[in-house]
From Swiss-Prot:
Basic and acidic residues compositional bias, start-end: 221-246
Subunit annotation: EF-1 is composed of four subunits: alpha, beta, delta, and gamma.
Name of this chain's protein: Elongation factor 1-gamma 1
Taxonomic path: Eukaryota, Viridiplantae, Streptophyta, Embryophyta, Tracheophyta
Keyword set, alphabetical order: Elongation factor, Protein biosynthesis
InterPro entries recorded: EF-1-gamma_plant (IPR044628), EF1B_G_C (IPR001662), EF1B_G_C_sf (IPR036433), Glutathione-S-Trfase_C-like (IPR010987), Glutathione-S-Trfase_C_sf (IPR036282), Glutathione_S-Trfase (IPR040079), Glutathione_S-Trfase_N (IPR004045), GST_C (IPR004046)
Length: 418
């Protein structure tokens, strides 16, 4: 009998087992036509879990409920699974972080979110306490992640899977960028995890909440209406001439979308799309054609060049994780594609790998909306390029060209944002 998971779409508690299955090579099928509130109320379902909780895993040995137990079962289905670490102490630390994730992160997120969604009574004082407790928990997690890429060891474990799935509810539903910016290492960790192929296959593209949900107010109960006494009809008056009816107010026309401040800058002689086409279409003599063309086009009054250096290179001990981290950064920069061009280099033949970049932005400074919206910006040191300095100018050319070796070291990867 195959493993069958009963759940609804988008259930972060089901994600735990499904991601563990992807890492473990264990086949888990989803129950067909599952409908929350219907399927989990049937006699057959209630035999597996008398209180009808979701998810449930059907196994050859009987049903398993509670999401962490299900994820553990799936992980244990593969012998010597690295998701459980390689030593007794690693196993203990994995269990430690799974418990922390449930009691500190998930529980406090729920105490903040569920009353706002109408699933529990909303009490302002209780909400303040829940937020304070969640910040305390995220602060502890942030401290741990300041010097660790993963929760335990040097690769993904079940602790990372459970923690990321529990963080997902907060990031996706209630924890806005303004809230999570206090915890930059938690942000980096979360976005790195959800962009791993096995996570992404299950979770899809993850977006952060734009706002905190409004408190759901219950509609007031309708007042009982007393039966009205029959009124005696008054003699009808002669009909008066109708006054001109007041026309209903016209719907307000939708306001035009405010222009991006960068669109209001004085015109530049540099046409960014022309440079991007030149970059993409130059296959030979890159230095003579593309690099020379770039400097011929470059307008220091309309654009600015910036070097960036990752602040936490000591954490870059795994090549694919480092490259995925850079890939996630470029995905989140998509909001400024119209106004920017970038090159990101992963440097070194052995860990820890260095991450450096070059960015061309419209305007004399890094756009404010990029600094506000893309959390990765805080993870880099940014230095404005002085093109009057020939050494800096040559460094720009080398980064655009992916020149190897770069500053005496091999290039592990080079990514272009265009």
């Amino acid at each position: 009998m195959a493993l069958v998971l009963h759940t609804f779409d988008g259930n972060k508690n089901a994600f735990k087992a499904l991601i563990a299955a992807e890492y473990s090579g264990v086949k888990v099928e989803l129950a067909k036509n599952f409908q929350m509130g219907v399927s989990n109320k049937t006699p057959e379902y209630l035999k597996m879990n008398p209180i009808g909780k979701v998810p449930i895993l059907e196994t050859p040995d009987g049903p398993v409920f509670e999401s962490n137990a299900i994820a553990r079962y799936v992980t244990r289905s593969k012998s010597d699974n690295p998701l459980y670490g390689s030593s007794l102490i690693e196993y203990a630390h994995i269990e430690q972080w799974i418990d922390f994730s449930a009691t500190e992160v998930d529980a406090n997120t729920g105490k903040w979110l569920f009353p706002r969604l109408g699933f529990a009574p909303y009490v302002a004082v209780s909400e303040e306490a829940a937020i304070a407790a969640l910040k305390r928990s995220l602060g502890a997690l942030n401290t741990h992640l300041a010097s660790n890429t993963y929760l335990v060891g040097h690769s993904v474990t079940l602790a990372d899977i459970v923690m990321t799935c529990n963080l997902y509810m907060g990031f996706a539903r209630i924890m806005t960028k303004n809230f999570t910016s206090e915890f930059p290492h938690v942000e980096r960790y979360f976005w790195t995890m959800v962009n791993q192929p096995n996570f992404k296959k299950v979770m899809g593209d993850v977006k952060q909440a734009d706002s905190v949900p409004q408190v759901q107010k219950k509609a007031a109960a309708p007042k009982e209406q007393k039966p009205k006494e029959a009124k005696k009809e008054a003699p009808k008056e002669a009909p008066k001439p109708k006054a001109a009816e007041k026309p209903e107010e016209e719907e307000e026309a939708p306001k035009p979308k405010p222009k991006n401040p960068l669109d209001l800058l004085p015109p530049s002689k540099m046409i960014l799309d022309e440079w991007k086409r030149l970059y993409s279409n130059t296959k030979t003599n890159f230095r003579e054609v593309a690099i020379k063309g770039f400097w011929d086009m470059y307008d220091p009054e309309g654009y600015s060049l910036w070097f960036c250096d990752y602040k936490y290179n000591d954490e870059n001990t795994v090549s694919f994780v480092t490259m995925n981290k850079v890939g996630g950064f470029l995905q989140r920069m998509d909001l400024c594609r119209k106004y920017a061009f970038g090159k990101m280099l992963v440097i070194g033949s052995e860990p820890p790998f260095k991450v450096k970049g070059l960015w061309l932005f419209r305007g004399p400074e890094i756009p404010k909306f990029v600094m506000d919206e893309v959390y990765d910006m805080e993870l880099y040191e940014w230095t404005k390029v002085d093109i009057s300095d020939e050494a800096q100018k040559e460094r720009v050319s080398a980064m655009i060209e992916d020149l190897e070796p770069f500053e005496g070291e091999a290039l592990l990867d080079a990514k272009c944002f265009k």
